[in-house]
């Protein structure tokens, strides 16, 4: 039997990294008896080691809690634990769409941060009831009144009735549960209407196939029902219905307003796309739910094994990861310098780092990552054999003939940065250096909120690291894409001994090409070992060399065996050596060690 709508509450928790979101979720589970003391572990909802270590949530998780409130009624509380990071913004928007309210968790010592804001605004767009929870009130540095003022000034939410809590110490947990019941509205829905359910998330389970997280809007989901995904157009037979408490629990059915999971013998996560609408195959709904969009990769980079024999292992590992992450795309590529590998697409830099870290950690692979690049749009003029067309460029090495390119467009983002006043100057300079356009600057209680428009290309490298180091870790940063704009961009190639090295080519702005090229050449000069002949290292745009360094040759003393005698004998030996070196320079291969590549790519943006 499904729970009456009036006794269901669906809510998510919005918080910046490290503000105590997962700990609060743990305490709510513990208080309502979802797990016994023995089963309780820190960060129950974060399954991956990386999630626990970095203190971030990557995949959305859901827990159904049963809570008997002070009014004597027993309520079904569905907690959606959502990712907090900008790379997973679309997953967050779908998770929020499945709820009617949200707990806004703010650290009593840190105050409101940029990422919190982005998710709060999304929550407000979904007409959510937002309950502020000020966490970590037992810290010595906690300043509750200041944080209340920030919530009111920055977000515009009344904070006088905010719940004061310390998830770690277990303070304010019951008050939080009572606030959820009293302030978050129950869902609306009709059990008799045709089935409409939103696909909130999906992941691969080796025993059950793809497990699909759904929020039922209208109708009822039952075992043995034939369902249809409206966007993908595929039909499936449900073989299991249930919920997480957080243990997997099988149910007979899931009704309107409820959140649960279904499995249907699906083998590929790509078929179960986040945001799709699930309906009955025999009596389908009239229209899918709004807001669905295809997730497009934003950042691309090449992944190569350091040992060529690991290529098959890398292929298998990437395919396994893809089972759980449909937003991650890959295709095979080969490079003269690095051998065989894959060109992979990611939602953003954190996504790239996580995939890379999971490959090295879970699959024990040693990887080289080429410089990340973004998606450029090229307008090509017509030729004798081809009409004019627009193409997307994911890999700088595939850049067509510059004479055919009429215009290159690059993606831009709008970034919101929060920073304490004393670090404002250096941060503004950093944004200016990255071709940023300042849009707004406001002050809120000792902190500045800066809005900048920046090219994504300039942010992709190490913008976030530089931002953190300049502000000693106090700045927080959030961004969203605002479309493509034309730019004066050129492809910079690196030539070692007059041979282009494809893995090091990159697309740069013409204004910064020279300094980037010079930096790269200087670095390679330090990294490549000396050979028996001299090696030129050049950075070039088209046919024009913009920077050059030369690695001097090692010298072998060929005249050492001559004692006295005629000077022409020595001359002859030196001439012969000169000839040999000339021939070596023409035919000799320069051995670029793997470490040189890794260091050059890692340092890709200091030039």
From Swiss-Prot:
Subcellular localization, as worded in the UniProt entry: Cell inner membrane
InterPro entries: EF-4 (IPR006297), EFG_II (IPR041095), EFG_III/V (IPR035647), EFG_V-like (IPR000640), EFTu-like_2 (IPR004161), G_TR_CS (IPR031157), LepA_C_sf (IPR038363), LepA_CTD (IPR013842)
Binding site for GTP: 18-23, 135-138
Pfam families named in the record: EFG_C, EFG_III, GTP_EFTU, GTP_EFTU_D2, LepA_C
The family this protein is said to belong to: Belongs to the TRAFAC class translation factor GTPase superfamily. Classic translation factor GTPase family. LepA subfamily.
Superkingdom of origin organism: Bacteria
Keywords (A to Z) from UniProt: Cell inner membrane, Cell membrane, GTP-binding, Hydrolase, Membrane, Nucleotide-binding, Protein biosynthesis
Assigned EC number: 3.6.5.n1
Residues annotated as signal peptide: none
Membrane topology: Peripheral membrane protein
One GO MF term attached to the UniProt entry: translation elongation factor activity
Catalysed reaction equations from the record: GTP + H2O = GDP + phosphate + H(+)
GO biological process: positive regulation of translation
Protein name per the record: Elongation factor 4
Disulfide bonds listed in the record: none
Known role: Required for accurate and efficient protein synthesis under certain stress conditions. May act as a fidelity factor of the translation reaction, by catalyzing a one-codon backward translocation of tRNAs on improperly translocated ribosomes. Back-translocation proceeds from a post-translocation (POST) complex to a pre-translocation (PRE) complex, thus giving elongation factor G a second chance to translocate the tRNAs correctly. Binds to ribosomes in a GTP-dependent manner.
Underlying gene: lepA
Gene Ontology CC annotations of this record: plasma membrane
Organism expressing this protein natively: Sphingopyxis alaskensis (strain DSM 13593 / LMG 18877 / RB2256) (Sphingomonas alaskensis)
Residue ranges constituting the tr-type G domain according to the UniProt record: 6-188
């Amino acid at each position: 039997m499904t729970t009456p709508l009036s006794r269901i509450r669906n809510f998510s928790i919005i918080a910046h990294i490290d503000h105590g979101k997962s700990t609060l979720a743990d305490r709510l589970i513990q208080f309502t008896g979802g797990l016994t003391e023995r089963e309780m572990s820190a960060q129950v909802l974060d399954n991956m080691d990386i999630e626990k270590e970095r203190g971030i949530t990557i995949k959305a998780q859901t827990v159904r809690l049963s809570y008997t409130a002070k009014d004597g009624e027993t309520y079904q509380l569905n907690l959606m634990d959502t990712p907090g990071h900008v790379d997973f913004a679309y997953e967050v928007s779908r998770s929020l769409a499945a709820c009617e309210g949200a707990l806004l968790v703010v650290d009593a010592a840190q105050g409101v941060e940029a990422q919190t804001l982005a998710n709060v605004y999304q929550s407000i767009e979904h007409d959510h009831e937002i309950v502020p929870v000020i966490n970590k009130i037992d810290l010595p540095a906690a300043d509750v009144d200041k944080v209340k003022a920030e919530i009111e000034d920055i977000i515009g939410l009344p904070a006088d009735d905010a719940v004061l809590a310390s998830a770690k110490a277990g303070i304010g947990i019951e008050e939080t549960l009572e606030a959820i019941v009293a302030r978050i509205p129950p869902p609306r829905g009709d059990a008799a209407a045709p089935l409409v359910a939103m696909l909130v998330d999906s992941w691969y389970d080796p025993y059950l196939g793809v497990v699909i997280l759904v929020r039922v809007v209208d109708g009822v989901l039952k075992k043995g029902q034939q369902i249809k995904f409206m966007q993908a157009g595929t039909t499936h037979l449900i073989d299991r219905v249930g919920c997480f408490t957080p243990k997997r629990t099988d149910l007979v059915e899931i009704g309107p307003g409820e959140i649960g999971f279904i499995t249907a013998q699906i083998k590929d996560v790509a078929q179960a796309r986040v945001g799709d609408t699930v309906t009955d195959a025999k009596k389908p709904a009239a229209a899918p739910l709004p807001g669905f969009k295809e997730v497009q990769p934003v950042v691309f980079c090449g992944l190569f094994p350091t040992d060529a024999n690991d290529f098959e292992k890398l292929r298998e590992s990437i395919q396994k990861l893809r089972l759980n992450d449909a937003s991650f795309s890959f295709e095979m590529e080969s490079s003269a310098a690095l051998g065989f590998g894959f060109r992979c697409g990611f939602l953003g830099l954190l996504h790239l780092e996580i995939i890379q870290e999971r490959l090295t950690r879970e699959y024990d692979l040693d990887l080289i990552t080429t410089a990340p690049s973004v998606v450029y749009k090229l307008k090509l003029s017509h030729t004798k054999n081809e009409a004019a067309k627009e193409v997307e460029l994911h890999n700088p090495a595939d850049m067509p003939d510059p004479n055919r390119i009429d215009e290159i467009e690059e993606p831009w983002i709008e970034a919101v940065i929060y920073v304490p006043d004393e670090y404002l100057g250096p941060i503004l300079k950093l944004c200016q250096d990255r071709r940023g356009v300042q849009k707004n600057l406001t002050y809120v209680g000792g902190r500045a909120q800066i809005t900048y428009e920046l090219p994504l290309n300039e942010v992709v490298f190490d913008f976030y690291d530089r931002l953190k180091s300049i502000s000693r870790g106090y700045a927080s940063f959030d961004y969203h894409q605002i479309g493509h704009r034309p730019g004066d961009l050129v492809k910079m190639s690196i030539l070692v001994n007059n041979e282009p090295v494809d893995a090091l080519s990159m697309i740069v702005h013409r204004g910064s090409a020279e300094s980037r090229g010079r930096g790269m050449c200087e670095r390679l000069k330090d990294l490549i070992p000396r050979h028996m002949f001299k090696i030129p290292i050049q950075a070039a745009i088209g046919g024009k060399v913009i920077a050059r360094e030369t690695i001097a040759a090692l010298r072998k003393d060929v005249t050492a065996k001559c004692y006295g005698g005629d000077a022409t004998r020595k001359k002859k030996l030196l001439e012969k050596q000169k000839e040999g070196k000339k021939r070596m320079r023409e035919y000799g291969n320069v051995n670029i060690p793997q470490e040189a590549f890794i260091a050059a790519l890692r340092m890709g943006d200091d030039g």
